[in-house]
UniProtKB/Swiss-Prot annotation:
CDD domains according to UniProt: CHS_like
Listed name of the protein: Chalcone synthase H2
Species, as recorded: Humulus lupulus (European hop)
Alphabetical GO biological process terms: flavonoid biosynthetic process; polyketide biosynthetic process
PROSITE patterns membership: CHALCONE_SYNTH (PS00441)
Statement: the UniProt record of this protein carries the keyword Acyltransferase: yes
Lineage, opening ranks: Eukaryota, Viridiplantae, Streptophyta, Embryophyta, Tracheophyta
């Protein structure tokens, strides 16, 4: 008779969890940041709030965002005037929209990832779906399983309302699933649609206005598994370790409340300051075991909550400007897509490395770090190992 130890050994993978494919998708509706203040104040019937509009223009100018993608078109907003008010009961309209659109956008990204992976979708054993938009039962994980035609026995995990750090969380969870279940192939999807947070401007709630200047829609999907099949599966990054922590003295720094008026955000403290003050501790904990203490020797993927966070992290750690190139590029081209951002940055980095003829998927370097920052203040730290190109 076999022992429990033997069973456990047989169940576990040999090597580390590895990202085997990446796919991304956005809604078709593209919005230029330079034109957005005029559009936003017009569509929300707020053109009389001239001072507020000037303030919003400055926010948009400083955002370092060139364009964003949004499911909400002018037509949809005209049909749903309560979404354009500052605080009108609108949760039904918002939810009815996102419970359909979130899995749909997720399917687009997942289809691209599955195609790149090159394996039959029947080999997907687990689904991890993450969104801060739209809650129904059965959830977006179920809807995606149906839309893609995955096996009914696929093991699903649904993560709701995690916020901007969750791109790191899904990697941490997928790593554990892949390494503890031999042969597991995990489909990870982050799909975010801002229809749940869009609202008109108000003088008393400037935090909301910051969100209106930064947030965009997007979906990213990964296939993650350990022990890649040689010649068939092509590793992109290895997931070496993953940690989560709540920053000290950060209670209420970022809060989100899902109520009748939709999802409202409150930024109550100096978020960039809190992150930059504490980030080195997370780096030391993650990289000391590897004997790494030069943060410029790493490739960097950081959730671009906004330009101030990136500027302060860069300054605090004395990072060379090129370290956050991929991160700033994604912020500029898509805005802050919450949990999906860091996965878009992974995609941008590996694409640019191949284009530039670099030796590895991590800008020619061996080791890298991925950071997620969000409500809590919660920080996810993932240690990545690049793969030779």
């Amino acid at each position: 008779m076999v022992t429990v130890e033997e069973v456990r050994k047989a169940q576990r993978a040999e090597g580390p969890a590895t990202i085997l494919a990446i796919g991304t998708a956005t809604p078709a509706n593209c919005i230029l940041q330079s034109e957005y203040p005029d559009y936003y104040f017009r569509i929300t019937n707020s053109e009389h709030k001239t001072e507020l509009k000037e303030k919003f223009k400055r926010m948009c100018d400083k955002s370092m965002i060139r364009k964003r993608y949004m499911h909400l078109t002018e037509e949809i907003l005209k049909e749903n005037p309560n979404l354009c008010a500052y605080e009108a009961p609108s949760l039904d309209a918002r939810q009815d929209m996102v419970v359909v659109e979130v899995p749909k956008l997720g399917k687009e990204a997942a289809t691209k990832a599955i195609k790149e992976w090159g394996q039959p979708k029947s080999k997907i054993t687990h689904v991890v779906f993450c969104t801060t938009s739209g809650v129904d039962m059965p959830g977006a994980d179920y809807q995606l399983t149906k839309l893609l035609g995955l096996r009914p026995s696929v093991k699903r995990l649904m993560m709701y309302q995690q916020g901007c750090f969750a791109g790191g969380t899904v990697l941490r969870v997928a790593k554990d699933l892949a390494e503890n279940n031999k042969g597991a192939r995990v489909l990870v999807v982050c799909s975010e649609i801002t229809a749940v947070t869009f609202r008109g401007p108000n003088d008393t709630h400037l935090d909301s206005l910051v969100g209106q200047a930064l947030f965009g829609d997007g979906s990213a999907a990964l296939i993650i598994g350990a022990d890649p099949t040689p010649e068939i599966e092509k590793p992109i990054f290895e997931l070496v370790s993953a940690a989560q922590t709540i920053l000290p003295d950060s209670d209420g720094a970022i809060d989100g409340h899902l109520r009748e008026v939709g999802l409202t955000f409150h930024l109550l403290k100096d978020v960039p300051g809190l992150i930059s003050k504490n980030i080195e501790k997370s780096l030391v904990e993650a990289f000391k075991p590897l004997g790494i203490s030069d943060w410029n020797s790493l490739f960097w993927i950081a959730h671009p909550g906004g330009p101030a966070i990136l500027d302060q992290v860069e300054s605090k750690l004395a990072l060379k400007p090129e370290k956050l190139r991929a991160t700033r590029h994604v912020l500029g081209e898509y805005g802050n897509m919450s949990s999906a951002c860091v996965l878009f940055i992974l995609d941008e980095m590996r694409r640019k490395c191949a284009e530039d003829g670099l030796k590895t998927t991590g800008e020619g370097l061996e080791w890298g770090v991925l950071f997620g920052f969000g409500p809590g203040l919660t920080v996810e730290t993932v240690v990545l190992h690049s793969v030779g190109i």
